[in-house]
Amino acid sequence: MTMKLLHLDSSVLGPYSVSRDLSASIVKTLSEKTAGLDVTYRDLAANPLPHLSGLTLAAAMGNYDASNDDATKADLALGGEVLEQFLTSDVVVIGVGFYNFGIPSQLKAWIDRISVAGKTFKYGAAGPEGLCGGKRVIVAISRGGIYSQGPAAPLEHAETYLKGVFTFLGITDLEFVVAEGVNMGEEAKAAAVKGAKDSIATLKAA
């Protein structure tokens, strides 16, 4: 059975992005270790998804009839496509820039499209239950400063947020590759990237 990998990038820095470099290295490593890996790529910065509108959300919840609203119908169709792409993937690799203590808004727009009650989680008698337990998610994060420890640690809202999101969706096979301090000089950046790539080299096959 062919394994499907969804590769997402969210940094707006293009070729200057460390997280893009790391996510590409992850996909390359997994492809080398996994025969016939089927990779789909989506650049959330170059081709950003629209943020959820009130009408789209209302229509999705059954509170608004969008049958005569072409714009909302198109937005719903796009959301369905993004959701299906996620649901049919076995592995998801995400490159994440760290902006103002959190994730890029482009990535948040994607998360809003895949966090769908009845599809990726459900509400039961005991509360919410994730429905995506069979997936593996690998997140590559680049941070300009040091947020894993020290006085800035309480300001880290990217890795912690994504752990919360994917755990909520039922995903327990969740890995983070982090390069931090990349804006603290060339020596610090080189050491951070090398450490991250050393970790990537040890990743198991898809």
Describe the residue ranges of each PLM region.
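Cofactor-binding loop segments of dinucleotide-utilizing enzymes, especially the Rossmann-like FAD-
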Residues: 10, 142, 179
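Short, structured loop/turn "capping" segments at alpha-beta junctions
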Residues: 117-121, 172-173
